[in-house]
Amino acid sequence: MPRPRPLLLAVMAATLADIILAADPAPAGPAPRPPNFLLIMADDLGIGDLGCYGNKTLRTPHLDRLAREGVKLTQHLAAAPLCTPSRAAFLTGRYPPRSGMAAHGRVGVYLFTASSGGLPPSEVTMARLLKGRGYATALIGKWHLGLSCRGATDFCHHPLRHGFDRFLGVPTTNLRDCRPGAGTVFGPALRVFAAGPLAALGASLAAMAAARWAGLARVPGWALAGTAAAMLAVGGPRSASCLGFRPANCFLMDDLAVAQRPTDYGGLTRRLADEAALFLRRNRARPFLLFLSFLHVHTAHFADPGFAGRSLHGAYGDSVEEMDWGVGRVLAALDELGLARETLVYFTSDHGAHVEELGPRGERMGGSNGVFRGGKGNNWEGGVRVPCLVRWPRELSPGRVVAEPTSLMDVFPTVARLAGAELPGDRVIDGRDLMPLLRGDAQRSEHEFLFHYCNAYLQAVRWHNGSAVWKAFYFTPNFAPAGANGCFSTHVCLCAGPAHVTAHDPPLLFDLTRDPGERRPLTPEAEPRHREVLDAIDAAARAHRARLRPAPDQLAPRHLMWKPWLQLWGGGGAGGGAGAQDDSGHAHGDGSHAHDDPGHAQDRGDDDAHYGGHATTRTQATPR
């Protein structure tokens, strides 16, 4: 038998080795640690307010740094042009009507802490999903999604019931009425929302009383008493709330306790930024989700002495620049702790700038939406197109720009997938994973259609087909005065009623690729595909509505009104019983979160020159 040749033996050995290696591959290296998440949201910030989006006069160096080091999105869209529904959609990845967080009436946000509406406990937030994956979770800043349902301390809508381990912030929002000398929103609100019903009830009461006194008709006493009670129900709570609004509604909570009443705006931005840095420090050894929700730049405007009067845009500009400082302070904490590479940082605004905000002398107190029409409260691009910056050094190339349509709702599935959490299978999730676009693996958004709601009413639909982005309006707000860029007579545009909106049949159609400012509606004569585009959009709208399950209206008048038995006083958490627990049943209230970590000095950095180098004293939580 001939002996095998050496070359043949070598080939056979190599082949056998390949087979063995293919059948039993070498063990892979350890899987990368799931990222941390720092999600930052401004309030009422316009896309035209940041240097990285073209502003040349406001100083936003820390946000501009995020843009350079990460990805900038230029067609990022709020799911609603108002605070409450937009934030509900952000945390759940769902259009606001799916959770009942879209009003059928005129008022679309919570004004009182003692209202019974809020984000339903049945909704699944990103915090709840990530908490189930072992993440530490915190919300610092503004909530605005309700507090309690039936009693002042049941806290059914509280952040701790929605997956957050830690909450330091305001349960509702920042309003002019919260800061002495900043004016009021209730004068216009009473005029717009209560004047008509009160006038009608008053006229009825006067007519019945006159008829009874003159003997012209037999008017029972219960009719007079009932009408008077109705007047009290309409005007009384609002008037009482106006008189005592600040102590009742403007307070800072530390978990379940009232930590400060009324809110002290001095050093508030520093306090929130320091609390965020402290949370990072305490949880640097485990994955975390931190939602930093600034009160800036909603009125009432505020800024510490180091920022007040420094900007070229008055109190509004001062607020923007102080907020940017706060962002920088938290980014510096990530750097100091060596966490920047492993942390996905996301920055946005809940909706566009409030263009109707004016000062006592008529000066502009709101922000800039750049070239875009409209603003907060309506679905023109200025109301829903918001800044968006995403940085994750481990995964994302710096300096990229994504111009595709994306949504605040996309953060929910993106965060869930990266954390290894399973999306809930018993409900529709409207958001889409952003990572293929952010990495550059995909060039097209997964959103073919996006639906723009004004409260519970579908106002417009966006269609991204091919290279075009079409937008069709079923109704548009009536700007007042005529020719203005907002609804100055009502302080914000309303969503229904012939005096406030104009219906369009056929819908008003724009091509945002050619006309991003929505100045030139298309006609059948100018656009050959006019009918084809509208037919496709109408079909998508019908299919979308067919998938909407009715949900209890959390912004119905009965849930919006002030209810004295829900008013939270004192420490709030004392004797809370079952109410003093988070969504997993863990009790809170030992006050341990209220103290600075004594083992770590808080480096102040060069930016503290704005504050004169003084540390801020943190108010302890009221004992519970």
Curated annotation (Swiss-Prot):
EC numbers, comma separated: 3.1.6.2
Start-end of Basic and acidic residues biased regions: 583-611
TM segment ranges: 193-216, 221-242
Free-text cofactor note: Binds 1 Ca(2+) ion per subunit.
Top-level taxon: Eukaryota
Catalyzed reaction equations: dehydroepiandrosterone 3-sulfate + H2O = 3beta-hydroxyandrost-5-en-17-one + sulfate + H(+); estrone 3-sulfate + H2O = estrone + sulfate + H(+)
Subcellular localization(s) per the UniProt record: Microsome membrane; Endoplasmic reticulum membrane
Binding site for Ca(2+): D43, D44, C83, D350, H351
Membrane among keywords: yes
PTM field: The conversion to 3-oxoalanine (also known as C-formylglycine, FGly), of a serine or cysteine residue in prokaryotes and of a cysteine residue in eukaryotes, is critical for catalytic activity.
Catalytic class of the enzyme: hydrolase
Molecular function via GO: metal ion binding; steryl-sulfatase activity; sulfuric ester hydrolase activity
Family stated for the protein in its record: Belongs to the sulfatase family.
Protein name, UniProt field: Steryl-sulfatase
Organism: Mus musculus (Mouse)
Taxon lineage: Eukaryota, Metazoa, Chordata, Craniata, Vertebrata
Designated gene of the protein: Sts
